[in-house]
Amino acid sequence: MSYANLEQTIEAAWEERAGISTATTGAVREAVDEALNLLDSGKARVAEKAGDAWQVNQWLKKAVLLSFRLNDMVPIEGGPGSSAWWDKVPSKFSGWGETEFRAAGFRAVPGCFVRRGSYIAPGAVLMPSFINLGAHVGEGTMVDTWVTIGSCAQVGKNCHISGGAGIAGVLEPLQANPVIIEDNCFIGARAEVAEGVIVGEGSVLSMGVYIGASTRIIDRTTGETFYGRVPPYSVVVSGTTPGKPLPDGTPGPGLYCAVIVKRVDAGTRAKTGINELLRT
């Protein structure tokens, strides 16, 4: 089925989604399964760059959501003490052996959870972490311990997502755009990027930086303020903006913001560059 036919079938099914269930067969189920296979293999992405802008393929998000109506809950083996989990989305690695892992070309350390419908590019390293369906992780990227990469989030190549960081998902609300981390970015430990924020290529977010759609991102050098995007090659730390005076004239509480303290330079690259030894 061509992409155009897939999109048409899924869009039509979405309009009639109330009537779709685990009993549904035929073209709708086949289209959703094919869409998930395209996402899983990396042949399609929920978001892709067209020139300087990112384009979101909403129909692929709809396919992911429709799969929850089509697929029933089943036991998933591999729980602690020979127990099982109970879910609708199988592991990406279900049925895999040495042949499949070698062909995929990435490392999956014990304790990482990757749901089917997500794509992991060759050379990536997955420490114990969680990667949700629809997500895309680029070539050579390190996903460190306790990282969460949410549904449909897009992470570029040669990135380092540090321990405990969160890259938020975007299955609801439906029209929301996914979080995008462009190539060669460093996301510090326990940082969080959410609500469709785009982190531009080569940027560095310090430990504990939180950025959502309404977070003020202030360039300390120019005074310029950004919302929803970090310009390429920015070094970002947490900060505060002065609060407005309270009614009695006393200083009001300051508000959180993210501060661009400089642009990436050789010193920054030396501290945050990827270690090729870990990717072999």
Swiss-Prot record:
<dbReference type="InterPro" id="IPR037133">
    <property type="entry name" value="THP_succinylTrfase_N_sf"/>
</dbReference>
<dbReference type="GO" id="GO:0016779">
    <property type="term" value="F:nucleotidyltransferase activity"/>
</dbReference>
<dbReference type="GO" id="GO:0019877">
    <property type="term" value="P:diaminopimelate biosynthetic process"/>
</dbReference>
<keyword id="KW-0220">Diaminopimelate biosynthesis</keyword>
<keyword id="KW-0808">Transferase</keyword>
<comment type="similarity">
    <text>Belongs to the transferase hexapeptide repeat family.</text>
</comment>
<dbReference type="InterPro" id="IPR001451">
    <property type="entry name" value="Hexapep"/>
</dbReference>
<dbReference type="GO" id="GO:0008666">
    <property type="term" value="F:2,3,4,5-tetrahydropyridine-2,6-dicarboxylate N-succinyltransferase activity"/>
</dbReference>
<dbReference type="Pfam" id="PF14805">
    <property type="entry name" value="THDPS_N_2"/>
</dbReference>
<keyword id="KW-0677">Repeat</keyword>
<comment type="pathway">
    <text>Amino-acid biosynthesis; L-lysine biosynthesis via DAP pathway; LL-2,6-diaminopimelate from (S)-tetrahydrodipicolinate (succinylase route): step 1/3.</text>
</comment>
<dbReference type="GO" id="GO:0009089">
    <property type="term" value="P:lysine biosynthetic process via diaminopimelate"/>
</dbReference>
<dbReference type="InterPro" id="IPR023180">
    <property type="entry name" value="THP_succinylTrfase_dom1"/>
</dbReference>
<dbReference type="GO" id="GO:0005737">
    <property type="term" value="C:cytoplasm"/>
</dbReference>
<keyword id="KW-0963">Cytoplasm</keyword>
<keyword id="KW-0028">Amino-acid biosynthesis</keyword>
<protein>
    <recommendedName>
        <fullName>2,3,4,5-tetrahydropyridine-2,6-dicarboxylate N-succinyltransferase</fullName>
        <ecNumber>2.3.1.117</ecNumber>
    </recommendedName>
</protein>
<dbReference type="Pfam" id="PF14602">
    <property type="entry name" value="Hexapep_2"/>
</dbReference>
<keyword id="KW-0457">Lysine biosynthesis</keyword>
<dbReference type="InterPro" id="IPR005664">
    <property type="entry name" value="DapD_Trfase_Hexpep_rpt_fam"/>
</dbReference>
<dbReference type="InterPro" id="IPR011004">
    <property type="entry name" value="Trimer_LpxA-like_sf"/>
</dbReference>
<keyword id="KW-0012">Acyltransferase</keyword>
